[in-house]
Amino acid sequence: MNPSEMQRKGPPRRWCLQVYPTAPKRQRPSRTGHDDDGGFVEKKRGKCGEKQERSDCYCVCVERSRHRRLHFVMC
């Protein structure tokens, strides 16, 4: 086979990576119980004892595994 026959026919391949933005800086709580805008962040315990923080814009669930690693889940 010559190099021209080895080329793939059709449109060229393009790699596409989607990067999801993180929460804007104003939505991240800087102090426990408060967000950056001065609003209060409500804390709860879930069914399995995981910590849940809920503010006006988002909810963060912190789960603890048996290997003592924290898993952050955006709700």
Swiss-Prot record:
Keyword Nucleus assigned: yes
Localization per record: Nucleus
Main location: nucleus
Tissue: Transcript detectable in many tumor cell lines and tumor tissues.
Region span, Disordered: 22-43
Biased segments, Basic and acidic residues type: 32-43
CC per GO annotation: nucleus
Keywords: ERV, Nucleus, Transposable element
Note: Protein expressed at very low level.
Role according to the record: May possess a function in tumorigenesis.
Name the UniProt record assigns to this protein: Endogenous retrovirus group K member 24 Np9 protein
Originating organism: Homo sapiens
Taxon lineage: Eukaryota, Metazoa, Chordata, Craniata, Vertebrata
Gene name as annotated: ERVK-24
